[in-house]
Amino acid sequence: MFLLHEYDIFWTFLIISSVIPILAFLISGVLAPINEGPEKLSSYESGIEPMGDAWVQFRIRYYMFALVFVVFDVETVFLYPWAMSFDVLGVSVFIEAFIFVLIPIVGSVYAWRKGALEWS
C-alpha cells in the first residue's frame, strides 16, 4: 500500500529549500538601498579607477576546448557508476556503454577533421 508519510522528509526538504532562497530574495529587496548615483553606476575594479575597456573579447577557440572538456567530463561522470558495477550488469549494458562512448568520439573526430580544434 502506498503510504504518503514515507515522503515526509522529501516534502520537508523541498519546502525548506524553496523557502530559504525566496526569503533571501525578499529580504535583500527590502534592505537594499534604492537610490542610484553616478558612483553606484560606475564599474568597480579592485578599489581603483578602471583602466581600458571593460569588454574583453575571448577567441572562440577557448570555448571550443572548454566545450570538449565538459562533454568528456560529463561522460566520465556517467561512466564511473557503470565501471564500478561492470561485472554484475552483463553484455547488453556493455554494448550500451560502448555506443555512449562512441558518439562523443565520433563527434570529436568530426570536429578535428573540420579544424575546429586547431590552435592557430
UniProtKB/Swiss-Prot annotation:
Keyword vocabulary terms for this entry: Chloroplast, Membrane, NAD, NADP, Plastid, Plastoquinone, Quinone, Thylakoid, Translocase, Transmembrane, Transmembrane helix, Transport
Transmembrane portions of the chain: 9-29, 64-84, 88-108
Protein family per UniProt: Belongs to the complex I subunit 3 family.
Top-level taxon: Eukaryota
HAMAP family: NDH1_NuoA
Disulfide bonds: none
Pfam families given in the database record: Oxidored_q4
Enzyme Commission number: 7.1.1.-
Enzyme category, top tier: translocase
PANTHER family: NADH-UBIQUINONE OXIDOREDUCTASE CHAIN 3
One term under GO cellular component: chloroplast thylakoid membrane
InterPro entries in the record: NAD(P)H_OxRDtase_bac/plastid, NADH_UbQ/plastoQ_OxRdtase_su3, NDAH_ubi_oxred_su3_sf
Protein name (Swiss-Prot/TrEMBL): NAD(P)H-quinone oxidoreductase subunit 3, chloroplastic
Record has RNA-binding as a keyword: no
UniProt KW NADP keyword: yes
Subunit structure: NDH is composed of at least 16 different subunits, 5 of which are encoded in the nucleus.
Subcellular location: Plastid, Chloroplast thylakoid membrane
Catalytic function, reaction form: a plastoquinone + NADH + (n+1) H(+)(in) = a plastoquinol + NAD(+) + n H(+)(out); a plastoquinone + NADPH + (n+1) H(+)(in) = a plastoquinol + NADP(+) + n H(+)(out)
Functional summary from the UniProt entry: NDH shuttles electrons from NAD(P)H:plastoquinone, via FMN and iron-sulfur (Fe-S) centers, to quinones in the photosynthetic chain and possibly in a chloroplast respiratory chain. The immediate electron acceptor for the enzyme in this species is believed to be plastoquinone. Couples the redox reaction to proton translocation, and thus conserves the redox energy in a proton gradient.
Molecular function as annotated in GO: NADH dehydrogenase (ubiquinone) activity; quinone binding
Membrane topology designation: Multi-pass membrane protein
One of the protein's GO biological processes: photosynthesis, light reaction
